[in-house]
């Protein structure tokens, strides 16, 4: 990771959760930081930030991967090999200095799965690129915020 990316991510974390903080923000599930897969490079930066934060807050990190299955296919017939996807995600998780649990969810509607996967308000870290136009990733984050989750956006 470049120093610029690390500084940007660290600065963003400091704004949201001060360095002296030793506990989770009020109203969110304690003990777990959830990272939503938003692309390989973006998620790597988010995982690195979540790992640093997890070290401070004595918590674990979970990586949630939402894999869409198109309508013509049966829900359990993923167009991507699950073994391949799991291998890539485990590789990505192993690249950070923290134990990361990987969860892969096959779905038709990502927002619907987020409703079920994040039942209790959670601390969620999402990686992305800075953009003036809200994209799919931003809309997913906004949907989580509407449900009461605390979302931290980490720019790549």
What are these regions (language model features)?
Residues 23-76, 146-147:
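Small/aliphatic-rich secondary-structure junction motif
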Residues 1-27, 95-124, 130-131, 140-151:
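Structural beta-alpha unit
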Residues 53-55, 68, 105-106, 133, ...:
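A composition-biased, non-transmembrane "mature-region" signal
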Residues 34, 60-64, 101, 123, ...:
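A structural signal for isolated positions on well-ordered beta-strands in alpha/beta enzyme cores
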